[in-house]
């Protein structure tokens, strides 16, 4: 269950890049995100509402420059929206709880799903399984 936060207060605490990504559907520069090379065991949450989205076991190195996962934590974690921006069709992924922009999903990922959830670090908050440390993206 998502930790209930005051949305206005939480959005006011976002950095410029976090706000650009989550609220304005922006994209951080490739290979720039804090969580790209994170190898720790834990849960990746939505930065805005702390809804659990992905677990470290589904993370893989796709070489694309953004954290990549082959599946979300559960079906309700993610909302899918057809995106026709930039003269192409993609599938945008948003937080299923607060609607924050996360990134896009592509059908070029590894098994068992064949999907690649390409997620901006700036939209995530990582919680370490060992010590509970939180690392905002």
UniProtKB/Swiss-Prot annotation:
Q: How is the cofactor bound?
A: Binds 1 zinc ion per subunit. The zinc ion is important for the structural integrity of the protein.
Q: Catalytic activity, per the record?
A: L-methionyl-[protein] + [thioredoxin]-disulfide + H2O = L-methionyl-(R)-S-oxide-[protein] + [thioredoxin]-dithiol
Major enzyme class: oxidoreductase
Q: The organism sits in which domain of life?
A: Bacteria
Pfam families per the record? SelR
Kindly list the positions annotated as binding Zn(2+).
Answer: 46, 49, 95, 98
Q: Which GO terms describe its molecular function?
A: peptide-methionine (R)-S-oxide reductase activity; zinc ion binding
UniProt keyword terms in alphabetical order: Metal-binding, Oxidoreductase, Zinc
Which residues constitute the catalytic centre?
A: 118
Q: Could you tell me the Gene Ontology terms of the biological process aspect for this record?
A: protein repair; response to oxidative stress
Q: Which residues form a coiled coil?
A: none
Q: Which residues form the MsrB domain?
A: 7-129
InterPro entries in alphabetical order: Met_Sox_Rdtase_MsrB, Met_Sox_Rdtase_MsrB_dom, Mss4-like_sf
Q: What is its EC number?
A: 1.8.4.12
Cofactor requirements of the protein: Zn(2+)
> Is this entry keyworded Translocase?
no
Cellular component, GO annotation: cytoplasm
Family of this protein: Belongs to the MsrB Met sulfoxide reductase family.
Q: Which PANTHER family match?
A: METHIONINE SULFOXIDE REDUCTASE, METHIONINE-R-SULFOXIDE REDUCTASE B1
User: What protein does this entry describe?
Assistant: Peptide methionine sulfoxide reductase MsrB
**Organism, per UniProt?**
Yersinia enterocolitica serotype O:8 / biotype 1B (strain NCTC 13174 / 8081)
Give the organism's phylogenetic lineage: Bacteria, Pseudomonadati, Pseudomonadota, Gammaproteobacteria, Enterobacterales
Q: What gene is it encoded by? A: msrB
């Amino acid at each position: 269950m998502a930790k209930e936060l005051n949305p206005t207060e939480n959005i006011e605490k976002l950095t410029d890049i976090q706000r650009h990504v989550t609220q304005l559907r922006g994209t951080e520069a490739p290979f720039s995100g804090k969580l790209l090379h994170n190898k720790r065991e834990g849960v990746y949450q939505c930065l805005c509402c702390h809804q659990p989205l992905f677990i470290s076991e589904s993370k893989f190195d796709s070489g694309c420059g953004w954290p990549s996962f082959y599946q979300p934590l559960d079906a309700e974690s993610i909302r899918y929206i057809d995106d026709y921006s930039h003269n192409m069709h993609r599938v945008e992924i948003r937080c299923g709880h607060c609607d924050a922009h996360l990134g896009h999903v592509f059908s070029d990922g590894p098994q068992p799903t064949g999907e690649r959830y390409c997620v901006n670090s700036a939209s995530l908050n990582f919680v370490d399984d060992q010590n509970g440390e939180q690392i905002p993206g």
